Amino acid sequence: YFREHFLIPVAAAAIIIALVTFLAVRFISPDARPALYAAVVDDALTTSEATNLQNELEDKLGVSVIIDDYFDMDKDGLTKLQTMLSSKQIDVIIAPHKIFKQLAGYGYLTNLELTVSKSDNTKLDDATVQLKGFSDADDDGIDSSGTGKGASKSYGLKLSDATGWTSIADSDHSALIGIATGTKNTGTAQRFIDWLYR
């Protein structure tokens, strides 16, 4: 009698309860984010070299690292970057000078004065690049944008001075690096920068 009348509903209920429990646990405890997420914009590094750098950093720093080189500004790279920055997933941005200047103007990078001053690495002083940031002044007109109208600050570092970067064969030696606005992993980002400028 049980098999004929109750087996299918009980089995279906058990499957539904298991599925709901699995989904609830999955949403409550998402995957741990990496200790360092570096966004490499517009082919400043090839995919194979990004993978090699990621593996080397994980060994050297002893933390989980993602070097994401899928930020093509001619396609959907800016949208992806904005989405990930708004959810505070990106720690470091590496981009060609022209794109980096644009990103600093949007307000996507932090002032590196504290990073440089906390580091014992003297190479960082010479590598610092001053760029105009974002201005959110109240006196801006309704139709004006604050992009690139902020004060010039140390938003980037020249990677041409970084031995860890220039030793990579296919890297863009004119690229800049900076720490993303809102990162929760500033310490790891600083360790990564110090490692590049070793």
Where are these regions (language model features)?
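Hydrophobic membrane-insertion alpha-helices, especially the h-region
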Residues: H5-F27
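Extracytoplasmic "Venus flytrap"/periplasmic binding protein-like
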Residues: G77-K149
